[in-house]
């Protein structure tokens, strides 16, 4: 089986806190209440204001270990040892290479693949690919693979028929006009896209991408 995930953000205090993994029970409860009764954006704004007003840091209030344990446990609950797992970027941030490798080795899957994200050490320096070569079978900023996928009917519902389709994978939706390759991709919207991060400045492109993926 082939699985996809993204934005694990191992070791990243800001993302850990914004996802609600806070080391103070009262603070966590209040944060989650704002998230549920208002919006995620309101909760994010509230916790950022809390850090500012109390002159503290996201590192001081977040629970990185619980965040990482939850991600790894969730992956291991679904992905098998002989399966294939694609991580579509933002593997880790603000932590050592050794810590990142330790997290990866706790994932019970022997076929790991990395699509590089903007927070990854090898985003600008591809020389750093060598840091992760022992755990990943492939490392790239963009990759296409062929997969057998269900055929959709005219209403968009899944049918019993399947067809071989090309899957384009990147950390961002590859519809930006940055260079020849992405312009070519923008002209081929029928291709199935898998991407990890969806940033606000890409709002106009949203209808043309498939979003975070699950399993196939």
PLM segments and residue spans:
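Conserved beta-sheet core of the metallophosphoesterase superfamily
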Residues: 113, 130-157, 161-216
